[in-house]
């Protein structure tokens, strides 16, 4: 049989069900990205791995301040200009739903990236990279939570932002950002989603130690815990030993 095959937690995808596992052949040329913990037995496809961060050192608050950031439209430019760390910024990533082209904006900690499968699952729709038009009211390069039309735009906050007292974020105004942005104080109560990619050295969602590493694999099999997903949807019934439904 194959050596170096492991079972990893996976996304159920179109098959559905609440739990599924893939059997992965570990290899550097594998097309799937896997997250493994060196401190426990946790193993997952990156699309099914919860992203966990520690924001305890970032809890201090500051006054909300509108600051000019002329021509500074990227995280690197803004953090360099304002002398702020990447993990104290609120980065916006914009998508559109395939079904109606409605905009979806996901906010994530500036040193992390969005995982599209996790975002798709959180939104409950297929997505594609956005084409931002003037009519959308979205100011590319300076997008922030405050002032967005949430009747037209679906807004999500990744849980990597939870607990950060003072963030740098876009002001939805060309050449301007806010410093000291506090989500609960300046935006309101939100329900955080898990849509960020896990990273090497990240915190394991099972044992809590910062010992995650990234590997690659080739899928050689898959199992799904489907429960009654298909039997109920197809209205399947059976006769018992007495011939009754």
Labelled PLM ranges:
Residues 1-245:
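Extended, low-hydrophobicity, polar/charged segments
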